[in-house]
Swiss-Prot record:
Family of the protein in this entry: Belongs to the PAPS reductase family. CysD subfamily.
Identification of the protein by name: Sulfate adenylyltransferase subunit 2
Enzyme class label: transferase
Pathway the protein acts in: Sulfur metabolism; hydrogen sulfide biosynthesis; sulfite from sulfate: step 1/3
GO molecular function, one term: sulfate adenylyltransferase (ATP) activity
Naturally occurring in which organism (per UniProt): Pseudoalteromonas atlantica (strain T6c / ATCC BAA-1087)
Amino acid sequence: MTSSIPNVTHLKQLEAESIHIFREVAAEFDNPVMLYSVGKDSSVLLHLARKAFAPGKIPFPLLHVDTTWKFHEMIAFRDQMADKHDLDLLVHINQEGVDMDINPFIHGSAKHTDIMKTVGLKQALNKYKFDAAFGGARRDEEKSRAKERVYSFRDENHRWDPKNQRPELWSIYNSQINKGESIRVFPMSNWTELDIWQYIYMENIEIPSLYLAKPRPVVERDGLLIMVDDERMPLEEGETPEMRSVRFRTLGCYPLTGAVESTANTLPEVIQEMLLTKTSERQGRVIDNDSSGSMEKKKMEGYF
């Protein structure tokens, strides 16, 4: 299986670096947690965490912040993985947001993301008093993530200050925090999207089938192909879902995630597309286009 991937050594180096980071954090922090958003990066992150502590169990829980607007397949896949690998899975929903009926159609992507994702995440971190949170973000995804450290320091309000980051020389990480402070940890910072796909293929990692092309009901809005995942999505006048062969490069709340037209329904075909693509995987994420520098603003407020 591995012979068709030219940079296996490179992938093994990335794997070793990520495993080292997992073990460092587990040894240095009192109460770590792994953020599990169910996408391809989370699937690789889970695989790496299991490798880091094999043959034992992962020594920290997984946290999924459920906005109630994820693709149904993502939730089913999440529960399937939790059962299969005997994971300590925590699911948190911002009940205040649910009570206010916050949703992306009425309130827009920015408010929905802030209340159901950012506030929801901070609620969970405060509730369980986690001092370190693993995430699957990579530097190649987006410009604000490109300048974030592996150990990303957060103050007592979970805020990130991009102008006040700690140096990381020779893979030496500064884990010193005061009471109430925390860090976000990104073991896959140095991976690329292509690395992720090649590693998924090499290690035979399970992922949601949303990443593979098949006919799906979509409508075109603001230049994005939005999949009609359930009856809650209001159709505009004259709008009719049509079946198109599409897949997703990134996953989030279904009303805020654009599909790409594709016929790639196997991992080798997806990898071939990655070799030829000229666009960012996050071009289909509505939340990244709320305003200029919106991702950095969200992260400064406590976003993933």
